């Protein structure tokens, strides 16, 4: 199969040295999904590709691709970089984890659909200074569908009731209303935490405004999401361990 020279727009979210002077990098792209590219000579100080392979560089990348395996980064046309991410440990930790999580939800060259914008909006919101914990929880909850384990959050799993007091049941695969609290095992969340999880899972991230959520409530919903992931996805990501160290949890 002949290789095509193609322009893709997206974000470089991961890189590692390959051999002596080359780099392997992962791109989150609108056109092709997740793509691993090799930047030949990218480690050399005078490399023309050096600027394009810095972590969290957004732009238009020209790649030589066969739509499988490793593509080759040839050049770039427009780049946007965020130098503050190199010194802001919190932002860096959150973003590294979110893209690592998304990287495990999709195969390479799999179309991302609306998840492309989900991660890009999350990236830009965190860079702009919005609460990274709330944004991370939105992404975590909405990526569950990409993993094939989307919970039912719009209504009670058992009776379909949409309003009232709810709790989350991992065994039932979603929320249960107070009428059925004794019917299934549940997480015993506060009503506010369950309401927050339902809201974050169903809210388009582009509609997220400036909101103030108490630290205790965020920690409760964070623990619940961690339990959901452990029971349904069961990933053990070093990036999550690092994030937990940074945020002290």
From Swiss-Prot:
GO terms for cellular component: bacterial nucleoid. InterPro entries: ARFGAP/RecO, DNA_rep/recomb_RecO_N, NA-bd_OB-fold, RecO, RecO_C. Gene3D superfamilies: Nucleic acid-binding proteins, Recombination protein O, C-terminal domain, Recombination protein O, zinc-binding domain. Disulfide bonds: none annotated. SUPFAM superfamilies: ArfGap/RecO-like zinc finger (SSF57863), Nucleic acid-binding proteins (SSF50249). One of its GO terms (biological process) is DNA recombination. Keywords: DNA damage, DNA recombination, DNA repair. NCBIfam families: reco. Belongs to the RecO family. Involved in DNA repair and RecF pathway recombination. This is DNA repair protein RecO. It comes from Lactobacillus delbrueckii subsp. bulgaricus (strain ATCC BAA-365 / Lb-18). The gene is recO.
